[in-house]
From Swiss-Prot, chain A:
It is found in: Cellular thylakoid membrane. CDD domains: ATP-synt_Fo_c_ATPH. This is ATP synthase subunit c. The chain crosses the membrane at residues 7-27, 57-77. Belongs to the ATPase C chain family. It holds the Pfam family ATP-synt_C. The gene is atpE. F-type ATPases have 2 components, F(1) - the catalytic core - and F(0) - the membrane proton channel. F(1) has five subunits: alpha(3), beta(3), gamma(1), delta(1), epsilon(1). F(0) has four main subunits: a(1), b(1), b'(1) and c(10-14). The alpha and beta chains form an alternating ring which encloses part of the gamma chain. F(1) is attached to F(0) by a central stalk formed by the gamma and epsilon chains, while a peripheral stalk is formed by the delta, b and b' chains. The keyword Disulfide bond does not apply. The keyword Transport applies. GO terms for cellular component: plasma membrane-derived thylakoid membrane; proton-transporting ATP synthase complex; proton-transporting two-sector ATPase complex, proton-transporting domain. It is a multi-pass membrane protein.
Amino acid sequence: MDSITTAASVVAAGLAVGLGAIGPGIGQGSAAQGAVEGIARQPEAEGKIRGTLLLSFAFMESLTIYGLVVALVLLFANPFAG
Amino acid sequence: MEPLLASTSVTSDANSRNGDGDLCSSRETSERLKLSEDLESSGNNSGDLSAEYVLLQLRIFRINLVVTAFAAVVSILFVDLNAAISLLLGACSGIIYLRLLAKNIGSLGKSSSSVGKVQLIVPVALVLVVAKVPDLHLLPSLVGFLLYKPSLIIQFLLEPYARKNLVN
């Protein structure tokens, strides 16, 4: 792998993780805030709120995982490496 | 096999509370009894309330196992054995990831004020292992890892029926 490909892969890996984590991070923060407020306001619905939070977190965090996987593939299994 | 338990385990103490021993012959029946009590009464403690969450995780775990078995059989029949092994490895990672996520969400608001990121180690370790072992393939392992998403969707679709059965 030549030096330009290596440098571009490292930069792209950093961007994939960094940019890919911004949106889910904001979304998870607001979802957790809403869930904790909901549990505090309505403790009898705690199980249902936590279940819904688990579903939404699993789907939101998969966006971060996509970026993470792209970054790891670029770093450890780069298809552009000669 | 250990289910996806987050914080508190479901104990079958409904028998001792109610005194109707014939209804609580199996563990699942006692879990259902306890959950229907939880749904009916609103003034219980947090341990009783989290039983619904534990049962939800158990349902997701069972559906995940069924989806994983189906995907493994399909990949053995139509692709090859290495792809099926990679898919199974990814599916195991997905189950561990979901368990860690559920554990973090279970402790949200009790012992921690934010959801931890420990579960993200699992896909990192999966990709690293698949990249190092030459017999494993990356794409089937990622597909196997993401099998928890159809399980969650199926669980979401089946939830009204499960809730109806619990109330009845």
